[in-house]
């Protein structure tokens, strides 16, 4: 790890699957960040043991323990990979001690603005707290935004299917928050008039890769322009999530005014229906390749923090 002044020091709260994978990613590819501390609440955590073996300062006493570590004074960034409820407390505790600390929130708490790197990171480079939405949000919001920049999207519905094995206790405890946060971000970041999110935990063996289906109802538009926009956006996501890909060609259906669809809460709809199918394969840095849902979260969080850190280092 670098010891010069060209990198910002980061701590990770949450020593589970996401936190450990994020630590490995920062160690392998961090340009403007270095990992300085790993924080957990279970002294027997595999993530804490792994961090200690790699020379990272650790504590099993939560954010209170982090504040007592000698390295805390040097930490500029904190990634929170705990739970929505815990993040609210963690942010308040740490911000009281270090008002300028940057929080990258990987829970559905959404204290700060939603951040999807390829869509709106530039607008939030100075934000003290950014929320990475959810795995389903990171995979599908870029596709909604890709269509939104071509045609007005009235309704977006996404179905995120992930392997049961990749869903740890944190994911399972936040199912309601997942659907609520993702739905809101489909509107706020993706540009949809109304958003709906569904998550499916697939128990199949061997475990399946993350699959996401995006259904969009928009005004009539040039299909070629939509296809080009979607392909361009997918390539932009691949820059930081190499395993992200369109599973098949974009599909279109015309909804004539004479035979409109009825969307609960929206009423009758006619125009263009666009269906986009995405697959996310994990990089297998720490997690298995089928856990693309976790990989896209850690990759998006790292891409966000790296851009923020670069702006601080180069200031």
Swiss-Prot record:
GO terms for biological process: catabolic process. It catalyses: acetaldehyde + NAD(+) + CoA = acetyl-CoA + NADH + H(+). The active site is at residue 135. GO terms for molecular function: acetaldehyde dehydrogenase (acetylating) activity; NAD binding. NAD(+) binds at residues 15-18, 166-174, 293. SMART domains: Semialdhyde_dh (SM00859). CDD domains: ALDH_C. It holds the Pfam family AcetDehyd-dimer. It is an enzyme of class 1 (oxidoreductase). Keywords: Aromatic hydrocarbons catabolism, NAD, Oxidoreductase. Its EC number is 1.2.1.10. HAMAP family: Ac_ald_DH_ac. Belongs to the acetaldehyde dehydrogenase family. This is Acetaldehyde dehydrogenase 1.
């Amino acid at each position: 790890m670098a010891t010069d002044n060209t990198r910002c020091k980061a701590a990770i709260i949450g020593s589970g699957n996401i936190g450990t994978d994020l630590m490995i990613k920062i160690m392998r590819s961090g340009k403007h960040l270095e990992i300085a501390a790993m924080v957990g609440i279970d002294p027997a955590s595999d993530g804490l043991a792994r961090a200690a073996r790699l020379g990272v300062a650790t504590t099993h006493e939560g954010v209170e323990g982090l504040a007592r570590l000698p390295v805390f004074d040097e930490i500029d960034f904190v990634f929170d990979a705990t739970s929505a409820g815990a993040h609210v407390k963690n942010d308040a505790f740490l911000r009281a001690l270090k008002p300028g600390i940057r929080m990258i929130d990987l829970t559905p708490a959404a204290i700060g603005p939603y951040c999807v790197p390829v869509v709106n990171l530039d607008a939030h480079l100075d934000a003290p707290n950014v929320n990475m939405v959810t795995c389903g949000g990171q995979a599908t919001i870029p596709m909604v935004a890709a269509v939104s920049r071509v045609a007005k999207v009235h309704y977006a519905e996404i179905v995120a299917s992930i392997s049961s094995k990749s869903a740890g206790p944190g994911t399972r405890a936040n199912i309601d928050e997942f659907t609520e946060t993702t739905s809101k971000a489909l509107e706020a970041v993706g540009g949809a008039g109304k958003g709906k999110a569904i998550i499916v935990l697939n128990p199949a063996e061997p475990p399946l890769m993350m699959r996401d289906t995006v259904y969009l109802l928009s005004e009539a538009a040039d299909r070629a322009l939509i296809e080009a926009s979607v392909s361009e956006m997918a390539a932009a996501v691949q820059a930081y999530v190499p395993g992200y890909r369109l599973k098949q060609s974009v599909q279109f259906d015309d909804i004539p005014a004479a035979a409109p669809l009825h969307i609960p809460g929206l009423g009758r709809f006619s125009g263009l229906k666009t269906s986009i199918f995405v697959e996310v394969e994990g990089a297998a840095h720490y997690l298995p390749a089928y856990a693309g849902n976790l990989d896209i979260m850690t990759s998006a969080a790292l891409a966000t923090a790296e851009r923020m850190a670069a702006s601080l280092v180069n200031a």
